Amino acid sequence: MASDVISINLSDEAATDALAQRIAPHLLRGDCFLLEGAIGAGKTAFSRALIRARLGRMEDVPSPTFTLVQEYEDPEGDIWHCDLYRLTHPDEAFELGLDDAFEHAICLIEWPDRLGSDQPANASRLAFEALANGHRVTIHLSDTMRPRLSGVVGFA
């Protein structure tokens, strides 16, 4: 993991959308965001905005809470949006095909702690926190994503 860390206050849904729109065009196959935070902290809202920005259209992006995985076809790399909250063991994640997705898709993983020690080493971590007025996201960019995203998210 990178030592670079930045926190961004997102005052409303439009600010979350804007951040996702800045990030989306720079993602490549094999990129993974580990999305941390309590229920209602903004993980799904960010994922929804990033998926829509990446696909370039208003897409129905439901929370994968009950399906565990929602997959979206993108010519430049499929997008996997995963909610692992209901998993009880890391092996269950790999029964879903996540190991292959980590290599060949763009992955947005909510509740990544369910992966245990099997979290991808090249993943960036976004920690969301609900505030009285909006949300805060603390971004830890991985070494592989830092060159493409550091200027986009505000690292010097």
Residue map of PLM features:
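N-terminal pre-Walker A segment at the start of P-loop NTPase domains
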Residues: 2-20
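Conserved lysine of the Walker
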Residues: 43
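Short beta-strand-centered segment that lines the nucleotide-binding/catalytic pocket of NTP-utilizing
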Residues: 57-72
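Phosphate-binding P-loop
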Residues: 24-30
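P-loop (Walker A) phosphate-binding loop of NTP-binding proteins
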Residues: 38
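Hydrophobic anchor at the beta1->P-loop junction of P-loop NTPases
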Residues: 33-35
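Short phosphate-coordinating micro-motif centered on Lys-Gly-acidic
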Residues: 6, 90-93, 99-156
